[in-house]
Amino acid sequence: MMAIMIGVLVFADFQLLDAAGPISVFEIAARFAGSPASIKVLAVTPGPVRSSSGVELVARGLRPTGAISTLIVAGGEGVRTAATCEKTLAFVRAAAKRGVRVASVCSGAYILAEAGVLDGRRATTHWQRTRHFVSAYPR
């Protein structure tokens, strides 16, 4: 049985829950389905990535998305800075173009919007960021 490949994209000052929650959900779902899941933490620079709580996750670098079936983008305090990183945006665009299921948690929607993958689509983000999000990304 082939493993389902899931990537969780993080950045400096990401919200730990936004990464750990989806990781746990996919791990448990795969176990119940009897189908293995391979979950990888991804970031622009490989190595430890510090969350806003100070807890670090060890990430792989951004690699071609061919093997990934789902890409989850975390949110958090560092999201606006992360949304200006062209390597991050190019990776998200490439994943969407290849047909990878791309989703975000909370304010991770900023990265998806900046990458252009939300153009013409309805989206949501954290309620405290809604006004700014709508004005920054009206498309």
Task: Label each PLM-derived region with a short phrase.
Residues 1-102, 110-115:
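Extended, subdomain-level signal for the structured scaffold at the beginning of enzyme domains
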Residues 102-103, 124:
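Structural detector of well-ordered beta-strand residues that form the stable sheet scaffold
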Residues 119-139:
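A conserved active-site-flanking secondary-structure segment within enzyme catalytic domains
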